[in-house]
A protein has these predicted regions:
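Alpha-helical bundle regulatory/interaction domains
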Residues: 1-193, 206-207, 222-225, 229-243, ...
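DNA major-groove recognition helix of helix-turn-helix
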Residues: 200, 212, 249, 261
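Basic, nucleic-acid-binding surfaces and adjacent catalytic neighborhoods in DNA/RNA-processing proteins
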Residues: 203
């Protein structure tokens, strides 16, 4: 387990030695003794947090709402900068699901989340308690990843797939790092614009235009954390100018690009998921 230290924050981070058997699944393990007011930065994935240790975390969400323990969040959670995480002695496996496979694994459409947070137990019932107990019963992080991956694979096999056209459109957005022209997507899949927008939104949880913005922002944010100048990041990632980048970063995080460049969430992110940006 790698240790990441910044100021008083100490994080233990573990990564799987093998990729998931399900394309679109990535995982990391975390051990955090003191989690204090961590700003949640939006990410283009559905996130599952499975806690198993003695401690627990809490998410402070919009309008004073809180969620404790193991949770599921839709793509873009944290937009606007209002979501914070707190906790003591937290141990968890965090799973990121491509929205393309999220519906099959969750048993519900990401559209039902719409950037919000729900308890994992609300979606998985007894299976949520079962995986939490299993993770707590083993001492090896690699065994925890294997247990989690086996469960995800089983659920994926029996869950409903998204339309191939929707999966293809998402893939185009991701591989282009948000530089795809959304008006071309419908033409390229041979659907009407209305049909693609409706299917994309209902199956992946966000409309194509928002997906493009989120993927582009995610790539730009990780480059800012890597120390690149905002003007260069804006030029390289498809923003009209530095002011455009500034507005987008503010909209997604409630903070300036300079502040985002120092965000603990993103710094740890680059250790847990190297190359994700």
């Amino acid at each position: 387990m790698r240790t990441f230290v910044r100021g008083t924050a100490v994080w233990g981070v573990e990564c799987p030695q093998r990729p998931s058997r399900v394309a679109g699944v990535t995982m990391a393990g975390f051990r955090v003794s003191d989690l204090e007011a961590l700003r949640i930065v939006p990410h283009p994935a559905v996130t599952l947090l499975v806690e198993f240790g003695a401690g627990s975390s809490v998410l402070d969400c919009a309008a004073g709402r809180q969620e404790w323990g193991s949770i599921v969040s839709g793509p873009g959670l944290g937009t606007g900068g209002a979501v914070r995480a707190w906790g003591k002695n937290v141990e968890c496996v965090q799973i990121r699901l491509s929205p393309v496979i999220a519906r099959a694994i969750l048993g519900a459409s990401p559209a039902d989340l719409d950037g919000a947070v729900v308890s994992l137990g609300d979606l998985w019932g007894r299976e949520a308690s079962w995986i939490r107990e299993q993770l707590g019963d083993v001492s090896s992080w690699q065994d925890r990843f294997e247990l989690t991956d086996a469960l995800l694979a089983r659920r994926h096999e029996t869950g409903p797939p998204v339309d191939p056209e929707v999966a293809w459109a998402w893939h185009r957005i991701v591989v282009s790092r948000g530089l795809t022209r959304v008006d071309r997507l419908a033409v390229e899949v041979g659907w009407s614009r209305k049909r693609l927008w409706s299917r994309f939104r209902s199956q992946l949880g966000l409309p194509p235009k928002r997906a493009v913005k989120l993927v582009r922002f995610d790539h730009a944010a990780h480059r800012l954390v890597a120390g690149e100048a905002a003007a260069q990041v804006a030029a390289d990632t498809g923003y009209a100018d530095q002011s455009h980048l500034h507005r987008d970063v503010m909209a997604f995080t409630g903070a300036t690009p300079a502040t985002v460049a120092g965000e603990l969430f993103l710094a740890v992110d680059d250790i847990a998921w190297p190359g994700c940006g």
